[in-house]
Amino acid sequence: MPAGEGIGDSHELLEFLCDKLPVLDKLCRFKVANTIKCNSCEYSDTKMDSMIEFSIAPRTKKQSVSETIVDAATPFVLGDWTCEKCKNKGCTKQFLVGTFPQLLVFHMTTVNTSVSYTPILVLNGLKYALFAVVCFNGGHWWTYGRDLPPGNDWFTFDDKNVQSHGPQQFPLTENMRLLMYSRLNE
């Protein structure tokens, strides 16, 4: 099978590339934890994992990327969960990010919703600059991209064309599927 055959979307392509290119995987991979804590006896269970992208599903139109991260990390109650230790029902679950990667990729998981995003993103005191926006509409893919540091021109990469834009022509689009940020070394 040819490399990349059977890849259906940008998320699958990123997974494929990280699997084949360890250097890319190392740049994108970050550590996370899911913690469940019993609301009765305070027993807790934490599962460590790692990811190559942060999936976002905005709950409201034009919710910001930062707000979706806060939502994902906000503890929430699971009423039907049964504690292993005390057998009571009810727990609090929380998603935590342990480390942030050099390349931070956000994957839009919902269709027909949009998220607001900015050219600079600050998370946990780390500053990231947007360098690529992968878009999809009606079976057609295209990408906005630029060289870093910020201030360089944006380009549109389409099936047949590459179009140059000025550095101020920021690629705002409701067709975004991936946002790619690079950590700035300041």
Each predicted region: which residue ranges?
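Papain-like cysteine protease catalytic cores
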Residues: 1-55
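Exposed substrate/partner-binding surface patches
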Residues: 43-186
